[in-house]
Amino acid sequence: MTDAMPPATPHARPHAINPTGCVLVLVDYQHRLMPAIDRHADVVADALCLADAARVLGLRIIGTEQNPQGLGPNVAELRERCDTTLAKMHFDACADGLLDLLRTPNGTPLPDVVIAGCEAHVCLLQTTLGLLRAGYRTWVVAPACGSRTAANHTLAIDRLRQSGAGIVSLEMVLFEWLQTCRHERFRAVLPLIKARGPGQVAPGA
């Protein structure tokens, strides 16, 4: 990065996700990998919900693929929702050019990253640590992350929390992106919230 950003600090500070300076990063939802992921159907469904909400709200979506020649591309439904997809060999996508993609057209870094992906304890973990080192406020959507075992998922989320990432649910992200039930796109996002929720009435519905 050419523009210095302040070091990331733990998310104990009272920051909400900034919907006007945010990008969604979806890490390595590759079709050859997903069948081995614990809860893989729910993991992919939550990632699709994130991507659909981001598209409705006009947020950029960046996908990554680890060694796509070996593991294949991301699942088609997710790949087609991404504005761009970064092929990489490092487990940390920041080492293969992700930081260059986290900028506005005039080159200004977008300060907030919402991230989810697989595997939680490998590429998702290392990419998030790279973002934190680079100074990005980073939120990890835990239910949309997956590992082959639940234990590795839990350990990854615990470590990321200790490292300064914000750990959030799907609904936390969507409602912080919206901020108010008077948002002009609230009614467009509401069906996505209801589709992934237990059927309760969403705030402001």
Place the predicted regions along the sequence by residue.
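Short acidic, Gly/Ser-rich segments with clustered Asp/Glu that frequently serve as metal-coordination loops
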Residues: 31-36
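Active-site alpha/beta core segments
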Residues: 37-38, 44-127, 195
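Active-site-proximal loop->helix
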Residues: 76-77, 98-102, 149-163
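A glycine-rich helix N-cap at a beta->alpha junction
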Residues: 84-93, 159-171
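Short gly/pro/ser/thr-enriched loop/turn and capping motifs at secondary-structure boundaries
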Residues: 92-93, 122, 145-150, 174-175
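A charged, well-structured terminal subsegment
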Residues: 166-199
